[in-house]
Swiss-Prot record:
Its main location: cytoplasm. It is found in: Cytoplasm. Disulfide bonds: none annotated. Interacts promiscuously (via SAM domain) with EPHA5, EPHA6, EPHA7, EPHA8, EPHB1, EPHB2, EPHB3 and EPHB4 (via SAM domain) (in vitro). PROSITE patterns: SAM_DOMAIN (PS50105). It comes from the Eukaryota. GO terms for cellular component: cytoplasm. Residues 75-123 are annotated as: Disordered. Residues 1-65 form the SAM domain. It comes from Bos taurus (Bovine). This is Sterile alpha motif domain-containing protein 5.
Amino acid sequence: MCTNIVYEWLKALQLPQYAESFVDNGYDDLEVCKQIGDPDLDAIGVLAPAHRRRILEAVRRLREQDAAAAGLYFTLEPQPPPAPPGPSPLAVPTRRLGESCGGPSQGPRGDPRGQTTAPRGRELVSYPKLKLKIMIRDKLVRDGIHLSKPPYSRKVPMAGILEFLMNWPKSSQNR
């Protein structure tokens, strides 16, 4: 059986019998599960009306929690640079040599994230937030790192930090 967050979520809904179908249909993360609708439940094989209602209600709660906690997450994609203060917005933009009329080249969905840069012979790649999250989680599991256990979750005493910072110039002179 699968042991992931979707299984735990379905277990909490008292519907663990659908876990394998969810994973087989690509719903292996809660971010993906937030997109579930009636056609998806048909494909997964959730036919009982009570089960469908329970899952759709849980999906609605996931979306609400995501909207409520939106300020708690980092944005992993680069932000577009702010518009420089200057000429009025009615000014005609100038083109650079080799640039099409539409402006700088865009990614496949019309956003600049699809662009890659090649400094020093290495190509930089941008990953979507969900894929990057999964890659990081898998790497932590492969390396045996548990962020919920010491030393990663150990509380740092503030008094010790403050004392160190107060004595820092003295300790650096002793070297």
